[in-house]
Amino acid sequence: IRDLYVTGVQTCALPIYPSAYRFPRGLMERESLEFSFSGLKTSLLYFMDDFKESDSMTKKDVIASYQQAIVDTLVEKMKRAIDKTNVKRCVIAGGVAANKSLRESLRASLPEIQILFPDLSYCTDNAAMISFLGEIKYQSGDYESLDFGVKPNLKLA
């Protein structure tokens, strides 16, 4: 299970029971848009240390439950962001956008919002997309000096 990556989790999780085990949903008690998956990852590691596969719960059930905890968190935080901003259209990109369960849950939970997903062939690691954009900007001469101060608490919006 520790070797699974983005689409590996999705592939293993289908079509099993995503509520077989209740993994934590981090930072849900706060009204903020922040989220953290560190407790979820730790919970899975501890769970798997003691896990014994049985007729009532398989490793696929565990992975499906783990995936559901991630999807639930992302959907809830997205709902909160929509409530705060009143946007009517949103793009979901990066590797996580390839997850079928996330796509379905977002569309079902936010029917009033136009949610756009790139074709699966474009749902890759954000670092690659950012690097590519950086190369395009650099080649076109669109870049800034590297002489600036560090602002660790700089707001994104």
Mark where each language-model region is.
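Active-site metal-binding loops of divalent metal-dependent hydrolases
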Residues: G95-V96, L120
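Surface "functional belts" at beta-alpha junctions
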Residues: A97, Q114, K155
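Claisen-condensing/thiolase-fold acyl-transfer catalytic domains that form or cleave C-C bonds
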Residues: S101, Y122-Q139
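Conserved phosphate-binding/catalytic loops in two-lobed NTP-binding clefts
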Residues: C90, R107-I130
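Short, conserved micro-motifs enriched in small and acidic residues
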Residues: L4, S65-Q68, S121-N126
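Single conserved hydrophobic/aromatic residue that forms the stacking wall/gate
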Residues: I1-C12
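Acidic, glycine/GT-rich loop-and beta-edge segments that sit at the periphery of enzyme/chaperone cores
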Residues: K137-A157
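A contiguous, well-structured pocket-lining segment that forms one wall/lid of small-molecule binding clefts
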Residues: A13-C90, N99-L110, Y138
